[in-house]
């Protein structure tokens, strides 16, 4: 086991505080409408320019191991806030820095660290209640666009694009962000259920001009098995031919004579058929087939539940108004499924999503919900260079997370005003002893830090403006972009309540742990052994050679 270096008390806390301040000082310059850029060097490729707090935090690794521990703990604050609400990382970092700095001053002055922490926790619980009271629901497109604009560093086009996307696919619909190919941002909405599987044979194509298969009012056969024997399908093919409607076959695979027969039937015009592979793999494929069955009012033909393909009838088929199949995708538009059944299926998937432990599973379940509920919106980010593209994409993703959080828990006045009002709301709060009262003061003082930092980044005097804002009440605050005072909500400067709440809770939680730290342990750096081969004066045994 490697030898360890141990530091105690004040010596440990000072080292940790240095690390906290290095990371927080790098992150906090990005806060507010006039936040500055941070340039990140990459081991390959061009440097990345960003205003995203969590991107800056992730890059920082300090040489001194004790200082690095402090920096990594603040990085955890930014990460936790980002995971919970998708934004508010810089605010959380500024809050944590303020609580740690003020808290450690109090510890150095002889206060009991545990009572300080209890006081801070009390203040945060009170402030969170106050934020909930101040919160206003975020229901209309205008408010959603304003939240998106603020989070995308005052880029109005991004806010409007996100509001449009939410209008089209619903507030809980799936909205993804991709790198576009042009200079302009674009919104692409896929209506209906789309999955990444194309036609199994180009001979199914019936729209030669764009190379797609289009089926109007088709029957949809869903089979959880490989189909290679055409005899299994003959009864259903005959029934479909009599109905003179087209048929879409979605199965694990269609191969051999079964595929050949479907192609021949299509080419001769006997029955209009197309076949695609079922989406997903394993259990996810079974679940997605069941989703399609719910959407189209069909039944999945599966031997696991005793259904055989030979005995399938038209009653087992799903139906939709239209199906469009390209080389890579299949889109089912307007399935005839019962709305109550679809809602029930969506509720069931949402329940699974809440219980899922991995982000990947949650994302896939959310996609399934959106496909059932009516569509997916893709925001394609446009930019002139790759560096700008990466920076912009990160901002758009932040803005998207913010708007989701706003829809979930409502909005409060932005620009650090809500935290100032929350701090005022807990003025009368008292702890069990004087040390707890100091903890409450530390937390209340920290709640001013985001406003002060926004003002400092705008090149103004923080103390003057903070005092002016504190003298007002309600949503009155300072707009750093226009350098004017006014009603923040009316000016469209909003923060999602969830983002502000998460930032405060995570900052206080981790800062509280740092204040109560008494000992730090790290590995001693390993001594590098001298390179023996380099120090020997030449190659052994070859002294006489020239």
From Swiss-Prot:
Task: Name any one Pfam family assigned in the record.
Answer: Cpn60_TCP1
Residue positions annotated to bind ATP are: 30-33, 51, 87-91, 415, 479-481, 495
Key word Cytoplasm present: yes
- Where does the UniProt entry say this protein principally localizes? cytoplasm
Region Disordered: start-end pairs: 527-546
Top enzyme class: isomerase
Task: List the subcellular locations.
Answer: Cytoplasm
Composition bias, Gly residues:
537-546
Q: Which GO terms describe its cellular component?
A: cytoplasm
Q: Which reaction does it catalyse?
A: ATP + H2O + a folded polypeptide = ADP + phosphate + an unfolded polypeptide
- What's the stated role of this polypeptide? Together with its co-chaperonin GroES, plays an essential role in assisting protein folding. The GroEL-GroES system forms a nano-cage that allows encapsulation of the non-native substrate proteins and provides a physical environment optimized to promote and accelerate protein folding.
This chain belongs to which protein, by name?
Answer: Chaperonin GroEL
Protein's organism? Baumannia cicadellinicola subsp. Homalodisca coagulata
